[in-house]
Amino acid sequence: SGALESQPLYINDNTDPNSNSPIEIESFSSFSSSFNTIEFGPEVSLTIPSLLFINTNKYENISNTRTVFSASLNYQRRLNKAKLDFERGIQELTYGYAWSVKNKYIHQLDPISFSAVEVNKSAEFDDRINSLNDKLLAASFQNHIISATRYRFIYSDPASSNNGRTSFYYDANVESAGNILNTFYKITDRPRDATSGAYKIVGIQFAQYIKTQHDLRMYNKINDKSSFAFRFVGGLGIPMENLSDALPFEKSFFAGGTDKTRAWKARSLGPGSFRDSSVVFDKIGEVLLEGNMEYRFDLLGFLDGALFVDAGNIWLANEDSLRPGSDFKVNRFAGEIAIGAGFGIRVDLEFFIFRLDVAYPLKNPSLVVGERWFFQPKDEYNTYLNTLEFPLNVPGLYTPQINFGIGYPF
């Protein structure tokens, strides 16, 4: 798989920290936007139709048993004005099991998943990160190793099994990385790195975290020509001792993009109500909440239409003095939910669906309370823009986003 996307950087001299898997081609606000990021990820796997080393004879209800050995490579390269910002390469080896129960429940267990992540940064990009004095951002762009165990549960209830109109889908996963390694290193009294205070494998720090994500969907068929689709996604990741500043970049949550909160570019929303006054990098978080609703209907022949509303955001799990408003608070998070709406055209060619969605931001949580909705005055925000040396470089608050994709967003 692969993708091209536009991730422009907007830089201003005001550095006051107290200022408030469908295949996709990333959203962009105009056809003149340049693609500056390339990403591809080949994968090979060997599937054996049984659970190796496990006796399944006493389990009557399981079927479709599989043992999977896989190897994958993910490469990402981003440019800034034709110059390299960074390259990231991820090599992963996985050994896992999968099986079904009663043709409704799918279980996937990966006892061993080993990844090596190498980041090559330009000197200019590294200087920009260091100048921000942001430990979370710096931790996201460092070399590391991930030794993880994963479990995934999928429940699928087709419409034919209940009233013929409503179907449900639930996808939950949990992942633990580095915890066994960290415990082993402690028990065996291994030395820590003198500079970082962390344990390392062959000179590379290993990540330590726990992470879970839950995806619940409901599809309601109104008639043969129209239906509703709903989705709710929640996720939480907690970085732990050996890499405690942040989750690894590739394991972090993000908002925006072609199948999330479509009125924002991928990784341009959040975290929380934090307003980035110095530079727009990839915005990532450790807490994710998202809800989507679509009304899908036939138009003409192979053309279908959709009206949709997206809501969501990301947050940090802990308070960050450099990012006020970025942490998740029970008494504050509801007001920090971004909301967008739009319409889409889908070309249904049976073997795949080509999708074009146009989304408009209705509520922007990076603004102060009283200015977040599109119809509210923007006095404080306009004052803020006047403090910047290059205010025209800041993207517009309510610019429609055009998204292209293959397949439904959910």
Per-range role (PLM):
Residues 51, 345-354, 409:
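Metal-dependent nuclease catalytic cores in nucleic-acid-processing enzymes
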Residues 289-297, 311, 337-349, 401-405:
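Conserved C-terminal beta-signal and adjacent last beta-strands/turns
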Residues 78, 300, 312-316, 350-352, ...:
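Short Gly/Pro-enriched loop/turn and capping motifs at secondary-structure junctions
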Residues 305-308, 353-359:
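Conserved active-site loop/cleft motifs that coordinate metal ions or position small ligands
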Residues 1-169, 262-263, 269, 274, ...:
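Gram-negative/organellar outer-membrane beta-barrel architecture
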Residues 35, 282, 286, 330-338, ...:
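Short amphipathic alpha-helix initiation/capping segments at coil-to-helix junctions
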